[in-house]
Every structure is written in C-alpha cells, then in structure tokens.
C-alpha cells in the first residue's frame, strides 16, 4: 500500500450561513482510523439537502447562533467537513479490522446509531456531527 498523505484537499464549513462559509483548502489533516474504523478514499460525494440545511442553520429555524443546529440537537463544531452521501474505497483499517477490507468499494451509511457497540441516545450523521465526504478521505 502506498503511504497516505498527512493532509488532504477538502471543503471546510467555517460557520452557519451562505456559501461564503465554505472554505476550499488543501491542508486538512487526513483522518487516522482508530481501532474499529476504516479510512475511505472518497470516490464521489453528493450534495444532500442535509448539507445545505446544516450550513444554513435550518434545523434551528435559521438562528445561526443556535446551539442545536444539527440532527442530534447539539452545536456543530467548526470548522468541519460536510458531505453526508459518500462512496469510495477503503485504503486503511484500524487494528481490529481485517486488512482484507483494504481495496473494498463502499457506500457509507451516514446515520450512526451506535459507536463502539454502544447505542447513542440520538443518532449522529456523517457530515454533521462528524466529518463527512467533501474531502479526499473520510
């Protein structure tokens, strides 16, 4: 396997608002998979209404200062990478994931209902409560 870069290109959302809150960058750190995770090289990502609604603070009725402008009802930490709909190839795996998964084509389920086998009180969504697919890796 080729060594992965330390940084990637992507689009950071820097706050709630219009398109001026999207910042195209080439210095976003590449995520490192933890023990139970995989790292995906993004092949394609679509703009979902969730991406737009999150950016414009629609979930908090347009109050851009609201602390509940996400699916989970908690404040979004900025900057973040949006992109709820994403597919690609697995390029790295955590220590608890079979290396046979590397190279596998995947379509990501964006709704996270559990983390490390424990149910979440509210679901979290890729590109909202955690970084999504508007970057080279997720």
Please give the residue ranges for each predicted region.
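Short, Lys/Arg- and Gly-enriched loop/turn segments at beta-strand edges
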Residues: 113-123
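Glycine-rich beta-strand-centered segment in the early N-terminal region that forms part
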Residues: 29-46, 58-115
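Cytochrome P450 core scaffold surrounding the K-helix E-X-X-R motif
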Residues: 50-56, 117
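Eukaryotic N-terminal low-complexity, Ser/Thr- and Lys/Arg-rich leader segments
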Residues: 1-8
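A structural motif shared across PLP-dependent enzymes of the aminotransferase-like
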Residues: 114, 128-138
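Short N-terminal binding/cap micro-motifs at the start of the first secondary-structure element
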Residues: 17-23, 49-50
């Amino acid at each position: 396997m080729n060594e992965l870069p330390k940084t990637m290109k992507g689009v950071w959302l820097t706050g709630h608002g219009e398109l001026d809150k999207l910042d195209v960058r080439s210095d976003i750190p590449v995520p490192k998979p933890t023990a139970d995770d995989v790292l995906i090289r993004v092949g394609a990502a679509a703009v979902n209404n969730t991406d737009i609604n999150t950016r414009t603070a629609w979930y908090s009725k347009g109050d851009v200062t609201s602390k509940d402008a996400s699916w989970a009802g908690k404040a979004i930490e900025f900057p973040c990478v949006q992109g709820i709909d994403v597919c690609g190839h697995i390029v790295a795996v955590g220590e608890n994931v079979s290396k046979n998964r590397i190279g596998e084509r995947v379509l990501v389920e964006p709704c996270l209902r559990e983390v490390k086998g424990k149910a979440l009180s509210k679901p979290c969504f890729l590109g909202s409560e955690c970084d999504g697919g508007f970057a080279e890796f997720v």
